[in-house]
Amino acid sequence: MDLYEYQGRDLFERHGLPVLAGGVATTPEEARAIAERLGGRVVVKAQVKVGGRGKAGGVKLTEGAEETVARATDILGMDIKGHTVHKVMITVTADVAEEYYFSYLLDRANRTFLCIASVAGGMDIEQVAAETPEKVVKEPIDANTGVDVATARRIVTQAGFPAEVADQTVEIAVDLWKAFVAEDATLVEVNPLAKTAEGGLLLLDAKVSLDENAAFRHPDHEALVDQAAVDPLEQAAKEKDLNYVKLDGEVGIIGNGAGLVMSTLDVVAYAGERHGGVKPANFLDIGGGASAAVMANGLEIVLSDPAVKSVFVNVFGGITACDAVANGIVQALALLEQRGEKVTRPLVVRLDGNNAEAGRAILDGANNPLIQRVDTMDGAAERAAELAAAGV
């Protein structure tokens, strides 16, 4: 889960890291109250989860409450790269002398954590690494030992931080690691980490991503979810313990196992190229226990998407045998009818693996005109795409 800048700033502040005083506003009047509380010159920043705010006019320096209200009025509702601005963060300004960069992240490619540090902050770190790689230090972090003072000092020294800020940077590096671990983050990035004219260090920006799989350890993280941006179908699926991601397509996908579902997305996309460009409408993994109730919940979620014109149910029987899955599909359609959910869109079902023949016989015996059984994955994808194209 990616946080807004103001949420990252608040998280840093809770962990004792030095940030600018400020607040977040959703209306011009709230912006006025914050500006009056802070006093003097402030900066008004659009809160969107995308870069390029400054160039788009989403960052403004203001003097006094009236100008802050005017600029907040301009920014709220602004569209920045397809993201509508609903909130602005207002902070005091800082007299910046130098800008540095510091981050911790989960390095999935190398299965470790990584610290990236540079004295060339305030710009895209990837650009810095490409143009002047000697200015960027990348240090793998052992999860068992973490970042203590000695490790932090080694990184700070290697990155070439000036002597006058070295001790402060070491302290921030240790505290930032503690925050990274405590919050189960996959990224904490400070760009810039600024040296002020007075010689102190401030975290002027906050980019934070949290591991949603660790949400059970962090009930407070629920408050960080941007409810306005949550897809209602994804939320409904989450409440039913289903792994669902909405996509932009017409063929609903239900499968058991993430790998199989990913492969199903591919074959449907390929088949769709021959049928008007139809595409997968979702990712939905019902897991290993495809009971009637689970299948009914899955079908209900998929069919709640009005863009779906056909559904491809792709199941490979393993621990859960295909005959159990077939019974689940038949019973699921009956359950949906009982719930008042009139199912009218066709289901293309492919069963393979454990007890596949028995499962196919159950589907054939159901005599449900909505169920079309196809025994190969490619053939089923072709049929589902064809039906979706015909129903568009």
UniProtKB/Swiss-Prot annotation:
Q: Tell me the NCBIfam families matching this sequence.
A: PRK00696.1, sucCoAbeta
Entry GO terms, CC:
cytosol; succinate-CoA ligase complex
Q: GO annotations under biological process?
A: succinyl-CoA metabolic process; tricarboxylic acid cycle
Quaternary data: Heterotetramer of two alpha and two beta subunits.
Which residues does the annotation say bind substrate? N256, G318, I319, T320
The residues that the entry says bind Mg(2+) are: N191, D205
Q: What is this protein called?
A: Succinate--CoA ligase [ADP-forming] subunit beta
From the UniProt record, list the coiled-coil ranges.
none
Its top-level enzyme class, in one word, is ligase
> What gene codes for this chain?
sucC
Q: Supply the InterPro entries for this chain.
A: ATP-grasp (IPR011761), ATP-grasp_succ-CoA_synth-type (IPR013650), ATP_grasp_subdomain_1 (IPR013815), Succ-CoA_synthase_bsu_CS (IPR017866), SUCC_ACL_C (IPR005811), Succ_CoA_ligase-like_bsu (IPR005809), Succinyl-CoA_synth-like (IPR016102)
UniProt cofactor(s): Mg(2+)
Annotated source species? Salinispora tropica (strain ATCC BAA-916 / DSM 44818 / JCM 13857 / NBRC 105044 / CNB-440)
Q: What EC number(s) are associated with this protein in UniProt?
A: 6.2.1.5
Name the Gene3D superfamilies on file. ATP-grasp fold, A domain (3.30.1490.20), ATP-grasp fold, B domain (3.30.470.20), Succinyl-CoA synthetase domains (3.40.50.261)
- Keyword Ligase set for record: yes
Which positions carry the signal peptide feature in this UniProt record? none
Reaction it catalyzes = succinate + ATP + CoA = succinyl-CoA + ADP + phosphate; GTP + succinate + CoA = succinyl-CoA + GDP + phosphate
The record lists ATP as bound by: K45, G52, R53, G54, A94, E99
